[in-house]
Amino acid sequence: MRKPIRRALVSVYDKNRLIEIGTALSAAGVEILSTGSTAKNLADAGIPVVEVSQYTGFPEIMGGRVKTLHPRIHSGILADHDNSEHMAAIAHLEIAPFDLVIINLYPFAETIASGASFEESIEQIDIGGPAMLRGAAKNHGSVAVISHTSQYDQLLEAINSGGFTEAERRQLALHVFRTTAQYDLAIATWLGQAESNELPEWFGQIWQRKSLLRYGENPHQGAAIYSGSTSGIVDAQQLHGKEMSFNNYTDADAAWRAVLDHRDPAVAIMKHANPCGVAVCEQGVAVAYQHAHECDPVSAFGGVVAANRKVDMAMAEPLSKIFTEVLIAPDFDADALELLMKKPSIRILKCAFTMINPIELRPVSGGMLLQGTDLIDAHGDLPSQWNQVSGEPVDQQTMKDLEFAWRSVRSVKSNAILLAKSTASIGIGMGQVNRVDSARLAVSRAGDRVKGCVAASDAF
């Protein structure tokens, strides 16, 4: 059964589609109460509106910090329409109940992300908005609450259909509590960072499910992918292919991180989150792909390929002849994309360059490990900061190969040994329980190419 909308409170920061919503409410005979600039926008559009300060008899003060924090507002939001005592109490005080609350919050997360000052950020902490949202969500048996512009189409449908159903109001309330939880978490995290540069004493994160996956690492495991507060591989645009699997995502993330470690055109080929080959080449990603594939062509079959430059036809042609699970790059030439899309088995992702999250999380039984992300340009990573402690003086090409190997070995699971020549891996040993076996594995894969190569290890 739908509950009619007779009276609405509207106070929004984001004015997108405000006039459309106000017009629909007014046409349906809904009385609208509003605040400040929201009321002005509605009135300027010729939509009848009652200013909240006129209704409460209390003016907005302190630059708008206090405008809706008033018993006449919150009583109208919190009154249970099916509770005779509630209705008698507000009737005695000449307070009319609300059927609909439309609120969206000050953009706190966007403000701090823009580099705003501490004082500017403080002013973007919404107080009245969350209070009204939470009140309406608590009282969703009587009040429908709209907390985001993405819900406006649903609102318009409800206006035309005679109101919201109980199930719809419950879902809207659930969205509110998720929204305010994320809002408060952003504030708490920001204040904690402002207080200290150390790892936080308290840490939280809201994750939103992006999609369900067919299964997890194994067929008997359920799985889904969630997006957080930072962008990355989760936000990549899929241009072609079947839906991504759990293992596709883990390999794609590993490959993408591997190529972002390099400034020159780079390609990485991954299998089970380990590189089959990595290469950089000033001539472009086509040559880099060829060199990366030559490192271990057997393992590269069915792998995940990442490039840190636009994929052109010169790279697409050889890649299209080899079974590849996923290809990820910042962009694609039109002819290269057309060729690759003829392969039904390949998943093609377009991903914008993003800053790697400075914090890494790892679940453990009963808790979570948190550490700063292993950034490749940490102190000591640049060749200019190295000390040669033995052997003949190193020439420029050898130093270039060493820097490449050092940047590339970070993407190899420990114990890790990476052999390189001409800024391309020629043999990789990974995941062994002792470093000697990793070295043997790398040398065996390099074969005759091992002569004159350089080596990098992730430990002594």
Residue ranges and their predicted role:
Residues 132, 139-151, 155:
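Mobile "lid/hinge" segments at catalytic clefts and subdomain interfaces of large enzymes
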Residues 1-55:
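N-terminal glycine-/serine-/threonine-rich phosphate-binding loop
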Residues 154-203:
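Non-catalytic interaction/clamp surfaces of large macromolecular machines
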Residues 37-108:
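Glycine-rich nucleotide/cofactor/substrate-binding loop typically near the N-terminus or early
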Residues 30-33, 47-59, 101, 144-145, ...:
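Short hydrophobic/aromatic-enriched beta-strand-loop microsegments
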Residues 19-26, 106-125, 131, 255-264, ...:
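Short, hydrophobic/aliphatic alpha-helical segments
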Residues 81-127, 134-136, 387, 393-396:
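Active-site/ligand-binding-proximal alpha/beta "capping" segment
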Residues 2-10, 15, 100-103, 183-185, ...:
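ATP-dependent carboxylate/acyl-activation modules
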